[in-house]
Amino acid sequence: MAGIGELTIGHSPDADDAFMFYAITHDLVGIGDGARYRHREVLEDIQSLNERALRAELDMTAISAAVYPDVAADYQILCCGASMGLGYGPLVVSREPCALPDLAGKRVAMPGPHTTAFMLSKMFLPPVEAVQLPFDQVMEPVADGELAAAVVIHEGQLTYVDAGLYKICDLGQVWFEETGLPLPLGLDCVKRSLPSDLRLQLLDALQGSIRAAFANNAAAVDYALQFGRGIDAERGEKFAKMYVNDLTYDMGDDGVAALAELYRRAAAAEIIPAAPPVDVLFPG
């Protein structure tokens, strides 16, 4: 904990995270039963939050599902706050229409190495030369003809057409066709070193914040649109609702099964050394 009574809470400055943290940010939901903890929100891109989690810096934080095997010793997954694609997810886009096998040996822009999109790319793409770029810079070199394709996350899933690019495939659709499960992309987790009652209070606060966002949809969406990175209101709301759904409030058995399958496949493909136990904190 970062000081007496202060909790550090990390999430990304994205429309979906802003929507689910709306009530916490605006002090509509407190942490704890009666005695409210002070909290300090840390807003950083997901790659930076992943790196902070690897150093166990924050009390509660958003992470990529792909990084959990590396932080499982320090963090426990919360049953709420997950970003799960329901038959959709990161996109592979190119300047000219083509098929996935056509990318073999080509240079492909990808977001950070700890992102779930990168893990999925290693599962489903042919062998390519990965070019690591910040997630919001992957499309430009493809549009300019410098790279063959890009793996696109966040708002780019809705704006790639504006850049004159073509969708080769939706990795979330490929995942669903093979597994029949939702695609776990992002998680919220809490430090194992915190007292068990405090971990449950943080879980309750985040679930309460998500519940309040659904109940105060217009205000929560207006707030979330401030983090839409230049996209219009209609697409900003669409993006937020893509990744804040029923499984965000409670991932349930389907979410746990999806995480287990993701790590099983990653271990089988030798992307990670071994599949970690999927340790999820539920209420009660």
Model segments located where?
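Beta->alpha turn/N-cap motifs
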Residues: 45-47, 56-69, 134-135, 152-158
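Pocket-lining segment of extracytoplasmic ligand-binding domains
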Residues: 136-225
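A structural signal for short loop-to-beta-strand junctions that line the ligand-binding cleft
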Residues: 7-8, 74-82, 107
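Secondary-structure end/capping motifs
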Residues: 195-265
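Bilobed "Venus flytrap"/periplasmic-binding protein-like clamshell domains
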Residues: 3-28, 90-148, 155, 257, ...
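A bilobed periplasmic-binding-protein/Venus flytrap-type ligand-binding module shared by bacterial periplasmic
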Residues: 23-24, 89-99, 183-198
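A local structural motif
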Residues: 29-42, 124-137, 272-278
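Extracytoplasmic small-molecule ligand-binding "clamshell" domains
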Residues: 16-20, 30-64
